[in-house]
Amino acid sequence: MTVWNGTKEPFILKIKQKRSRLGSLLRIYKVFLPRNLNEKTLDAIFSNSFFSSDAKVVSMYGGGVLSIGDRCLIHGSIVLERAASKIEIGENSFLGFSSTLNSRKAISIGNNVLIAEQCLIQDHNSHAIDYQTRRNDINLAIARQVGNPKMDKDFSQVIEHPIHIGNDCWIGYRSIILKGVTIGDRSIIAAGSVVTNSLPSDVIAAGNPAKIVKKLN
């Protein structure tokens, strides 16, 4: 497993890979890099896992910790929303096309986990329950678009709790895993499910909200 401790500056990492004339795999980074992060460092971090040309790692405000085990295949996006964010992916795991891991707290994914296409795993609510606070979120988003990127959103009223997905789980197409959820080992989430509560090991869950439909053992 390799671990990256985030820089103090925001960055976006876009990974591309191609074969050289001799057949060896080359890694190409299209990235906005702070000065203290270079391609040699990135190679050391990601050398044991494969990132497709669609993969993206984003540190929105700088910082965060990303751990990725050996023999992983990443097609989607990994987003570290603040310096305290932590995302851990175990060995031999898969993140499908257009799927997103979005963390302000912590997301932990075990070994041999399959996450299908267009899934969302997010450990926070994004916005406050209070409507007036949400109005301000819109104003801030507009301000960033017109040249005030340093205006910070107030996350003090946004609820966040860590997510844990156990070993050998399968998260089906377009499923959503919300804050505070733990999914036990070997469990399966059916396509299109929204998981709002924790689930034990060895079950199949489906629906919105997801409920156990079958026990595997």
Predicted regions and their residues:
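Domain-scale signature associated with acetyltransferase and cell-envelope carbohydrate enzymes
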Residues: 1-129, 134-144, 149-151, 155-168, ...
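Short alpha-helix at the nucleotide-sugar/activated-sugar donor binding site of glycosyltransferases
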Residues: 114, 187-188
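Extracellular carbohydrate recognition
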Residues: 181
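Conserved catalytic segment of ABC-fold P-loop ATPases
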Residues: 184-187, 200-202
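A generic "structured core" feature
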Residues: 188-194
